[in-house]
């Protein structure tokens, strides 16, 4: 049987999904490993939402939740992307991927090692290229976004979002209390500054600025105080882009493909 290049991507959030989408379009067979309760904000472009809904779609590409790694082939043959809940990566040895991409973006290493695959790549800070993984991709907005790092680490997490239309930290909303999310606004809605967009139990969540609600954690999600729960884009004209892969994700995805091709991992 002809060998098809198999890749594992750890993580199914919006940046990870930009990478997954690009790899799929390039002809790779991709398995996505997710956690039990994904906390994606940009849910319309996150394959990990399949963990809750059984199925997800990003720009016409379908992700499908599976219960066992043995189901991968059937899903691949259907032209879809299998998504498996596996927080520790225990199926990696069983599948023996040609390459592994850590796209969890936890700002720290949650257990990925170079021994997991012939080629290993990690996105963002928390990894040292040449030690923890073979390559690291810079994820911080700015001149070096998407840079392939062969030795050393990505820029440490500053906790300050990249500036868009003059707004940085104001774009991101954190939970004012611990509790259950009750969303009053939906992704793509135009919201006004100080508008109540959600409730965390009885505590209101206010829009930090006027713009388009680019993302909000799913309704019913239990959040701790201080957790990132929403993202507002001050550019109202970006409403049409809430359900498409971002420029940042596409840039990072291109760098991952560069690493694969440069190291002989062809589709």
Where are the predicted features?
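Well-ordered secondary-structure scaffolds
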Residues: 2-267
């Amino acid at each position: 049987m002809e060998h098809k290049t198999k890749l594992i991507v750890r993580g199914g959030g919006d940046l990870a999904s930009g990478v997954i989408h690009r790899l799929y379009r390039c002809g790779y067979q991709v398995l996505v490993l997710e956690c039990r309760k994904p906390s994606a904000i940009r849910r319309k472009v996150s394959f990990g939402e399949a963990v809750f809904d059984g199925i997800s779609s990003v720009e016409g590409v379908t992700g499908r939740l599976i219960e066992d790694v043995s189901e991968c082939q059937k899903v691949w043959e259907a032209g879809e992307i299998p998504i498996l809940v596996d927080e520790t990566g225990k199926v990696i040895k069983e599948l023996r991927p040609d390459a592994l991409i850590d796209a969890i973006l936890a700002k720290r290493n949650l257990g990925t090692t170079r021994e997991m695959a012939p080629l290993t790549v990690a996105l963002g800070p928390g990894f040292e290229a040449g030690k923890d993984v073979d390559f690291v991709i810079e994820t911080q907005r700015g001149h070096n976004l998407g840079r392939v790092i062969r030795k050393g680490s990505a820029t440490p997490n500053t906790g300050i979002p990249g500036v868009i239309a003059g707004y940085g930290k104001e774009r991101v909303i954190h939970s004012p209390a611990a509790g259950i999310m009750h969303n009053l606004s939906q992704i793509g809605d135009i919201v006004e500054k100080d508008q109540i967009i959600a409730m965390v139990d009885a505590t209101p969540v206010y829009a930090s600025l006027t713009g388009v609600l680019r993302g909000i954690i799913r309704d019913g999600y239990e959040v701790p105080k201080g957790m990132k729960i929403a993202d507002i884009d001050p550019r109202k004209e970006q409403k049409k882009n809430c359900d498409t892969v971002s420029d940042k994700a596409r840039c990072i995805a291109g760098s991952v493909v560069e690493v694969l091709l440069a190291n002989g991992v062809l589709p």
